[in-house]
Amino acid sequence: MMDRVDFELGEKKYVCISVRSTNHKPFDVTSAKYILRNGDQEEKAGTCEIKQKSDTETVLSALIQPMIKGATYTLEYTYEIPPEILKYEVRVYVS
């Protein structure tokens, strides 16, 4: 099941995901970006803030402001833990 966040129209706030090591070994997220989509239409894209909480956990934050009331967006994170490139999606609802 996809994570979900709710926005009121006009809100601008951070949406954060936590990336954790599955094998309890240290890792580094070397880059992270996001795309906010309404259907197939890209509304915003940018670079995530990367905050390492510990050797085995990093938080990725995207500051977004969805602009269409009643819309359902997809916020797609793409991040790199060399040699891997991973993706994660969050559903964004605007009321």
Outline where the language-model segments fall.
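Contiguous segments within soluble domain cores/interaction surfaces
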Residues: 1-95
